[in-house]
Amino acid sequence: MSDSTTIALLSGGLDSATAAALAIEAGQKVIGLSFDYGQRHRKELQAAEELAACMGLTEHHVISVNLGSWGGSSLTDLTQTVPSEGVVDGVIPNTYVPGRNTVFIAIGLSLAEARHANRLVLGVNAMDYSGYPDCRPDYLKAYQSLADLANKAGREGHGIKLWAPLMHWHKKRIVQEALRLGVPIDKTWSCYSGGDHACGICDSCRIRDAALSEAGRSDLCSKPAP
């Protein structure tokens, strides 16, 4: 692989697909990396596969890391309820999965080093998901410092950059960029509820649908089962 290769953490959702598309636009070869971590919304994995094919990714890997073994989140523990009352400032919602991004980034860095990639792109953004501790600028800054020390590439002076281009964007801007880049939004999956149809009421659906409507694309909003 060349030094113009990016590893994209591809969940199957709108944010990660847009981040991957930005890497493609920048002329990078993009390798997708997705995770089966015991999430209730497993349909996102199907979405990730379809996105990888549609977007022409160089490779796409799906890794099993069963964080559902110990639960701790409504996304991995079916006894908990996915919230639909909206994000509360200063409160970490129960959709936070303990250690998820820390684990995913570590595996992404391993793949990046093996493929001699120079970047790892993530779709995290602090504006709409400020309750998640592992989606914040200070978290990524600290992780970058660790990454530069933790692998051969970093020690040799050509470390792997953690790139979060959406970090300070609101959802409407993400939608606008996705449309500009030709991201197949209809193939992305954001719903947390775990059904075959997007519920339209979980926080993830509500934030996505509001942004799509603001961007004039209400036709792409959730269509719950009748």
Swiss-Prot record:
Its cofactor is Zn(2+). ATP binds at L10, S11, G12, G13, L14, D15, S16, A17, T18, A19, A20. Gene3D superfamilies: HUPs (3.40.50.620). GO terms for biological process: queuosine biosynthetic process. Its EC number is 6.3.4.20. Binds 1 zinc ion per subunit. It comes from the Bacteria. Pathway: Purine metabolism; 7-cyano-7-deazaguanine biosynthesis. Signal peptide: none annotated. Keywords: ATP-binding, Ligase, Metal-binding, Nucleotide-binding, Queuosine biosynthesis, Zinc. GO terms for molecular function: ATP binding; ligase activity, forming carbon-nitrogen bonds; zinc ion binding. InterPro entries: QueC, Rossmann-like_a/b/a_fold. Zn(2+) binds at C191, C199, C202, C205. It catalyses: 7-carboxy-7-deazaguanine + NH4(+) + ATP = 7-cyano-7-deazaguanine + ADP + phosphate + H2O + H(+). PANTHER family: 7-CYANO-7-DEAZAGUANINE SYNTHASE. Belongs to the QueC family. Catalyzes the ATP-dependent conversion of 7-carboxy-7-deazaguanine (CDG) to 7-cyano-7-deazaguanine (preQ(0)). This is 7-cyano-7-deazaguanine synthase. The lineage of its organism: Bacteria, Bacillati, Cyanobacteriota, Cyanophyceae, Synechococcales. The gene is queC.
